[in-house]
């Protein structure tokens, strides 16, 4: 057991695999309790997992004894990592471009996700802590034409439609306009 404990930290790729497995297990455990990781936790996990994958593969390639093969494979891997990074980083930034705010409505704390691409929607989920939120949408506000953050903006935007959901995600009511 002591030998395994001393060996695991020396293999970064194995550590990264363990991290991914832990995240997946925690994701499913949270889902059982109707919870989800907050967006920043997912973003941090993806960043650490990507860095661990890159460093772990380079660490394994450095163990190759033939220098020519070692450096050729490292160059190929770095070129692939850069190419894939150039392709996936904009997609990742686009996927995480939605703003996230902590707000209080009717004395209840919510995590508000602003989706402002083509149409602006604000999706409210129950705030459960700095790492997790409820995974059932509680309120959805529709603001019309996209491209802005109605919560983080200094301007006040009128709500076109507000939809309220129950604990199971079923629609309770839909209110048109900026009515109470």
Task: Please name every model-derived segment.
Residues 2-24, 154-161:
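Membrane-associated alpha-helix detector
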Residues 10, 31-34, 63-67, 79, ...:
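Short, flexible coil/linker elements and helix-boundary hinge sites characteristic
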Residues 11-62:
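Membrane-embedded alpha-helical segments of integral membrane proteins
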Residues 57, 93-94, 104, 123-125:
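Generic hydrophobic, helix-prone segments enriched in Leu/Val/Ile
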Residues 67-96:
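Internal/C-terminal transmembrane anchor helices
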Residues 90-112:
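Alpha-helical transmembrane signal-anchor/signal-peptide segments
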Residues 113-180:
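Extracytosolic and intramembrane catalytic regions of membrane-associated proteins
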């Amino acid at each position: 057991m002591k030998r395994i404990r001393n060996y695991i930290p020396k293999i970064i790729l194995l550590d990264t695999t363990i991290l991914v497995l832990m995240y997946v297990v925690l994701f499913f455990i949270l889902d059982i309790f109707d919870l989800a990781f907050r967006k920043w936790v997912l973003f941090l996990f993806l960043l650490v997992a990507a860095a661990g994958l890159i460093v772990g593969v380079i660490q394994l390639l450095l163990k190759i004894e033939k220098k020519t093969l070692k450096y050729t494979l490292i160059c190929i891997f770095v070129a692939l990592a850069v190419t894939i990074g150039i392709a996936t980083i904009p997609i990742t930034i686009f996927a995480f471009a939605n703003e996230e705010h902590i707000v209080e409505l009717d004395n209840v704390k919510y995590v508000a996700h602003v989706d402002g691409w083509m149409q602006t929607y604000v999706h409210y989920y129950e705030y459960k802590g700095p790492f997790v939120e409820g995974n059932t949408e509680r309120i959805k506000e529709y603001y019309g034409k996209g491209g802005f953050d109605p919560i983080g903006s200094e301007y006040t935007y009128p709500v076109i439609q507000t939809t309220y959901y129950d604990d199971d995600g079923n629609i309770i009511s839909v209110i048109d306009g900026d009515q109470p």
